[in-house]
């Protein structure tokens, strides 16, 4: 009759080996599932931003030249964090109700908002069609009153490429979300090693304008 005793060394080694095998299979699957979830959430967020921009423009609150057509907005305007830019007679306060979640009220110094493993950033056009970022400190006086009525762009890229996401996404006034898988974009320009997409990363043409056609599948 076997006496009551603990595990033998061989039994412990077998258990450890089994756990190691399970971990080797499970951990990559868990990471892949998290990446997929973050990327799916990023696309959904861009669609929400696109919808918010359409609603904001329809109010004509940001009618900088008072021609009856509204312009597109920044995160702070859309979320009700800061007063709508000067221009429209009724644009003397916060957008109420806001058209975008309060989670977008606190962009960093670059104008980037972090959500679910991704950074998001809105660019609005200047007089040459180049992107400027009011959420990052660019004055609204640099935004072109005419072009902003038809043009805007928002990028989403991984906070940590390979760990929080692999793909970079973009949406603009067309409402179509496009993507590329590239390790060019990761983190924030406020961190060492961080590289955010330039305003024209997904746009065709050599003039660096955000008014051109989308270049699907490019790496910027």
Locate each region found by the language model.
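A short, surface-exposed interaction/processing loop segment used at functional sites
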Residues: 172-197
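Functionally critical, cavity-lining and gating residues within the transmembrane helices
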Residues: 24, 39, 55
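Phosphate-recognition beta-domain surfaces
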Residues: 194-199, 203, 220
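Extracellular/periplasmic head regions of type IV pilus-like filament subunits
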Residues: 51-174, 181, 203-219
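N-terminal single-pass transmembrane signal-anchor helix
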Residues: 2-30
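Aliphatic-rich helix starts adjacent to a transmembrane/signal segment
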Residues: 29-46
């Amino acid at each position: 009759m076997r006496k009551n005793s603990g595990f033998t060394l061989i039994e412990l080694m077998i258990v450890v080996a089994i756990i190691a095998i399970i971990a080797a299979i499970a951990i990559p699957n868990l990471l892949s599932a998290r990446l997929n979830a973050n990327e799916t959430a990023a696309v959904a967020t861009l669609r929400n931003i696109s919808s918010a921009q359409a609603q904001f423009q329809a109010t004509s609150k940001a009618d900088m030249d008072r021609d009856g057509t509204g312009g597109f907005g920044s995160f702070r305007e859309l979320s009700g964090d800061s007063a709508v830019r000067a221009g429209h007679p009724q644009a003397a306060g916060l957008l109420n109700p806001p058209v975008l979640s309060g989670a977008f009220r606190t962009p960093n110094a670059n104008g980037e908002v972090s959500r679910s493993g991704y950074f998001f950033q809105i660019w609005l056009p200047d007089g040459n069609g180049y992107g400027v970022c009011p959420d990052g400190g660019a004055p609204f006086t640099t935004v072109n009153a005419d072009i902003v009525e038809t043009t805007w762009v928002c990028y989403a890229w991984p906070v940590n490429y390979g760990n929080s996401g692999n793909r970079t996404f973009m949406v603009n006034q067309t409402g179509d979300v496009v993507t590329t898988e590239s390790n060019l974009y990761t983190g924030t320009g406020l961190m060492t090693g961080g590289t955010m997409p330039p305003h024209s990363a997904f746009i065709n043409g050599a003039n660096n304008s955000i008014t051109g056609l989308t270049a699907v599948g490019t790496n910027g």
